[in-house]
Amino acid sequence: MKKLEVFGANKLNGHINISGSKNASLPILAATLLSNKKVCLKNLPNVKDIHTMINLLQSLGSKTNFYNKKLIINNFKQKKNFASYSLVKTMRAGILVLGPLLAKFRNAKVSLPGGCAIGTRPIDIHLKALSKLGVKYKIVQGYVHATAPKGLIGSKISFPKISVGATENLIIAASQAKGTTVLSNCAIEPEIKDLVNFLISMGCSIKWIGKRKLKIDGVEETKETTYSVMFDRIEAGTYLIAAAITEGNLKINNLIPSIIKTEINILKKIGAKIRIKKNEVHIIGNKKIKSMNIKTAPYPGFPTDLQAQMMVLLCKGNNKSLIKEDIFENRFMHVAELNRMGAQI
């Protein structure tokens, strides 16, 4: 697509079903590498990163069949442990294959990741945590060369700061480590919990023993499973904000409202009328938008992935608003473009 032309001043009315979560699907796809059994994943979104991750799994030897949001994976002959730059460079989640490859083969060579330019997003937290499971690593010419000569060995690990990616990598790796691993200061995003639920469905032994604390008993074998990925809360939040911006009347289906209660509560305070049912949120936008201050934060705080959308909405506010970005240091690139359109930021 070279150009997308938007005709504004139209209200968003109607109803829409929310897609499966990309951010939940990617670590789950990486985790399938642990299994030598058939895995069936449902409700996968049809987006570029999903296809890239599937291509990465295929390059490692996985056999896949993706049709109508459903992916069947067979790893009977999966014996490769090299994740190339050509695939990992476009997607941050590519580094998530490091943990399962180490668990399966005791060594791996994985390219440093690429992805969107919204900050440094270093992987040092991943590597330092993996080293506590017995991993030795070095970075040579853009690749992580990692080995676990004695296999992965369970340990007590406390993340120095909350990291979604590091939490995911360690959960996957520890699921087949020898003994027990206790992870503290974990990210608790719904996508993390979806990953845990998927691994449990494969026969892994994982238990939450505190708000941000996990106990993982390593298993030698996994079992065949069928699993449906959770809804995309960022997509849901984007449609809710878009309805508020356009003063629309929108019903959003195929979601769990309690997971996005922070976003719902903020939209209510701003002036939107919202009704909630079991798997549905009905929003009616308001002409009068109340200004407010917002700070991004790890879940259950306001998500950084909705910060730009919320900024557009607050441009319509009745007073000054303040947005503080506490997750990434370079995520205000949209400000200049909004100012070109007449915003005062």
Question: Where are the regions a protein language model picked out?
Answer:
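Short, structured segments at the rim of ligand-binding sites
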Residues: 1-345
